[in-house]
Amino acid sequence: MTITKEKIAFMLNAELGFSKSLCEEVVNAVFTNILDIAKEQKLILKNFGSFEVKHKNSRPGINFHTKSQITIEPKNILRFVPSAKLKALINEND
């Protein structure tokens, strides 16, 4: 299931009764702040998980279509590690 910021704002509106525009502003502000923090340092959301930007150096790779060797460019990746509580919550119905 894909959930959008608009859907989260709609759920806040339905749950709390605040105006749609206020809910959209709050959701946008929360995501903007989370992204700003995650770019600079490890971000831990208690009982949810942690986000961290990791740098991957360039490395050799293979183009599967041509079978030729290529160099994969360095890049930053976002790593998410779920908390133990979130893992337990997801797996409690199994």
Swiss-Prot record:
An example molecular function term from Gene Ontology annotations: structural constituent of chromatin
Domain of life: Bacteria
One of the Pfam families matching this protein, by short name: Bac_DNA_binding
InterPro entries reported in the protein's UniProt record: Hist_DNA-bd, IHF-like_DNA-bd_dom_sf
Keyword Ribonucleoprotein among UniProt keywords: no
GO terms for cellular component: cytosol
Keyword vocabulary terms for this entry: DNA-binding
Family (UniProt): Belongs to the bacterial histone-like protein family.
Protein name per Swiss-Prot or TrEMBL: Histone-like DNA-binding protein
